[in-house]
Amino acid sequence: MGEKNGVIIRVTGPVVEAEGMAGSRMYESVRVGNDGLIGEIIILEGDRATIQVYEETIGLTPGEPVVRTYLPLSVELGPGLIGTMYDGIQRPLEEILKNTGDMIERGSSAPALDRTKKYRFYPLAKSGDMVREGDRIGCVRESVSVNHYILIPPGLSGTIHFIAEQGEYVITDTIVILDTGEEKKELTMIQRWPVRDPRPVRERLDPVEPLLTGQRIIDTLFPLARGGTAAIPGPFGSGKTVVQQQLAKWVNADIIIYIGCGERGNEMADVLEQFPTLKDPRTGHALSSRMVLIANTSNMPVAAREASVYTGITIAEYYRDMGYHVALMADSTSRWAEAMREISGRLEEMPGEEGYPAYLSSRLADFYERAGRVSLLGSGDHEGSISVIGAVSPPGGDFSEPVTQNTLRIVKVFWALDADLAYQRHFPAINWLMSYSLYSPIAGIWWEEHIGPEFIRMKQEMMEILQRENELEEIIRLVGPETLPESDRLLLLKAEILRESYLMQYAFDEFDTFTGPKKQYRMLKAIFTFFSQAERALETGISVSRLRGLPVIESFARMGTASPEEEDPLFESIARDTDAIRDLKEVL
């Protein structure tokens, strides 16, 4: 360790070639140059290694040393991850700020986890207990929202020879001595894990319930299952980042991992400013108390975008192994793909479509396939899940480009953001005609069992109304709305109510930003009860223009923004006004 192992012979952007690297392994982490830049071996030919460097390589020259670490690129896992902001290679940015100032100096490093902070350790096992990989042997309170379970690392089993008593310890203290039969192994609260290797599980399970987000169009029409995968493609300005941040704020997961991969720094600044002030609707604590942020902004080295994605999913797997439900947001996977394209070009590989490497689809699949609901290792019947939501930024909003198309082959939910809806100030700008979810049957059953009957019928009817409205728009453009029969005019009124009072949601309103499932069902029930009464009124000769002027239409628009105290009076008022429609024929 620490000896000079190789010498740089060529530098091209983030890619470095070195010789004298005989005995090295693929994906081994190395220190490059006099400044000790962090790199990873990606090609080996004889004693020559091609290294992907995760820091700025300006000033690096042939002849400088390359030092092996004899370890794969890994992350540190243990108490202290929650509430911390890292860069793509798990350097804590607040520590780097204290050490080097606003700009990260080349070769800067700091321990990923605080070695000085003490945590109160609660043992969950005793001396003499037989334990195996994945078993919980202790617990520390990592934040007000998260109990951090100390687990037997994968690949180890044996008898506990010693376990620390309840008390205050730093994460490097020995808390367990495990007799494996071959040796007595000291365990601390820290584990290291290679970022490219998925952590093992006992069994992969099918999703059985939706991951509720509080966003009406998602929960009702295009639900994501707990342990599922989703993509949010959209052109610039269509609201990808706001949707991602909304999901990070309100999704009903235990842990949130937010990866800012190649996006603008001010978006991460927004997250840093907002999240500590926001309250988790489930616990009442700050949202930052259950969140890990990984910031690899557009002005940071290109190669580190890949590392940031793998770092994030590895941390997510670690918390999943504790039995938590984790939601991971990657904004944006397109920037990661662009980094792959640049490095592939530097390596002079044969390009695929639009210059992306031929292995683009397999790399994306490797990432998304680490999501899922799983049965965990260890004694007992524990399960956890990772739900992955990846933003895609197709140039010009072209969904036929390779990153979007390869992502769509993998994920089960597609939320297509539409620039036209965004320009109309309809947010979330998810196009209901282009989007889809393969988890709808699972979610529909859950809604009917836990929230209320008729949900599936109302959802299907909503989609039929919106699709029929789209067909009628062609006719309206040609001949105008005056020529339509009253039944079609009523359908247009229904679609308008659904679009403006239900699907449209204001992210910056205190109450409209999040709508729970019971309120969503209540809103749908009120709207469809009105639709039934309106159809009967139409049969008795009442015009759609008369229905359009009723006060209940305005009340629908206030449902989303109503506070909990205002909800009951508002819905009672809507019910009275809806019932009064049957008396309209007497006024004619």
From Swiss-Prot:
How does it sit in the bilayer? Answer: Peripheral membrane protein
GO aspect biological process, one term: proton motive force-driven plasma membrane ATP synthesis
EC class of this enzyme? Answer: translocase
Keyword Glycoprotein, does the record have it? no
Reaction(s) catalyzed by this protein?
ATP + H2O + 4 H(+)(in) = ADP + phosphate + 5 H(+)(out)
For this UniProt record, the keywords arranged alphabetically read as follows: ATP synthesis, ATP-binding, Cell membrane, Hydrogen ion transport, Ion transport, Membrane, Nucleotide-binding, Translocase, Transport
Any GO CC annotation of this UniProt entry: plasma membrane
NCBIfam families (UniProt xref): PRK04192.1
Quaternary structure, per UniProt, is: Has multiple subunits with at least A(3), B(3), C, D, E, F, H, I and proteolipid K(x).
Main function: Component of the A-type ATP synthase that produces ATP from ADP in the presence of a proton gradient across the membrane. The A chain is the catalytic subunit.
Per its record, how is this protein called by name? Answer: A-type ATP synthase subunit A 3
